[in-house]
Amino acid sequence: MDRVFSVEDISDQFWSPPAREDSSKLVMNRSDSEWAFQSFLQQASALESSQPLPSDPVPVAGDVKNPVEIPANVPVDSEDYQAYLKSRLDLACAAVALTRASSLKPQDSAALLDNGSQASNTSQLVSQVPPKGSGHDLSKEEDKEALAATATPLLPALQKKSAIQVKSTTSGSSRDHSDDDDELEGETETTRNGDPSDAKRVRRMLSNRESARRSRRRKQAHMTELETQVSQLRVENSSLLKRLTDISQRYNDAAVDNRVLKADIETMRAKVKMAEETVKRVTGLNPMFQSMSSEISTIGMQSFSGSPSDTSADTTQDGSKQHFYQPAPTSHMPAQDQKIQNGLLQVPPVDNLQQHSASGPVEGNKMERTSSMQRVASLEHLQKRIRGGVSSCEAQVSGKQ
């Protein structure tokens, strides 16, 4: 608590002038505050003639409990005593400042200098009061009161700075925690009791902490969304892998069936070529066989039509045209014609082939149906070629007649 001295607080007596000391004694050789304050107390005790004052390395802050009566009617030089008090006060302020300078930040030291200036202003107020008494005891008590007035405004400021520094350290170590109500309450109390600069710094700290908390929440929400998308993509990937496995299995089965069908087609082609060669050997012997093959082709076409009327007409035909299938008498025919007739007996008629194919099992294999259709197609091709040869032979016979 700051103490302001007024004119009413000072008694109407003059102070005794202190003895002038050399300037070399006033210079502080060490930077340690304790030694400086000890020298100050020793110099103050040297002014006493009757009772010495023990040295105390700890600065005293507070009111004087045991006041000493001021002797009356002691002449004193007011200007010299004011200069002496001012020098003592500056020395005490410097000692306290050096003590706290090592543990404070630059902004804290600036605040300390402000408090020092306030203390100097207080000392100026004390020095402006005209002294009215003199005495060694009065000078000693006045020095103590001036030192108490100087230390009193300094100590609360230092306590505030240290409390704010401790709070900032605590808040910096607990940034990872999202909610810390106790610290917020402590910082609010510090803001109320501190100066405006500390309040601004605390508000800035709170805003930074709040922004960091919001950013952590946004990151957490973003990570949750990404994890959900990853799980969905994994499910879709597993379903696509199953479909791919199924499709690949079907493709392998289709490839095997394709190879089997190709082998069957090659086999049927070889059989068709062998049948064509056999037909060529038979049809190239005698033109008389071409006329008989024309009848066979007409019968075969009627049987291939598939209508019930055609098949019934084929069954009700007279036997006048069936002499192509019966062997002729061999008495008036040459040996070559007999060989041709014997060869015709070996060729199965188309009707028999159609009946054989129709009498087969209905529930046959797919490959057997394909082979039978290929045989029918090859026979139709042969019949077309035979009909072309028959027409040319008939033209030659009509020309000879």
UniProtKB/Swiss-Prot annotation:
The keyword DNA-binding applies. Residues 198-261 form the bZIP domain. One of its GO terms (cellular component) is nucleus. PROSITE patterns: BZIP (PS50217), BZIP_BASIC (PS00036). Residues 226-247 are annotated as: Leucine-zipper. GO terms for molecular function: DNA binding; DNA-binding transcription factor activity. It holds the Pfam family bZIP_1. Its main location: nucleus. It comes from the Eukaryota. Residues 115-127, 300-319 have a biased composition (Polar residues). SMART domains: BRLZ. Residues 134-146, 189-199 have a biased composition (Basic and acidic residues). It is found in: Nucleus. Keywords: DNA-binding, Nucleus, Transcription, Transcription regulation. Binds to the G-box-like motif (5'-ACGTGGC-3') of the chalcone synthase (CHS) gene promoter. G-box and G-box-like motifs are defined in promoters of certain plant genes which are regulated by such diverse stimuli as light-induction or hormone control. Binds DNA as a dimer. Belongs to the bZIP family. This is Light-inducible protein CPRF2. It comes from Petroselinum crispum. The gene is CPRF2.
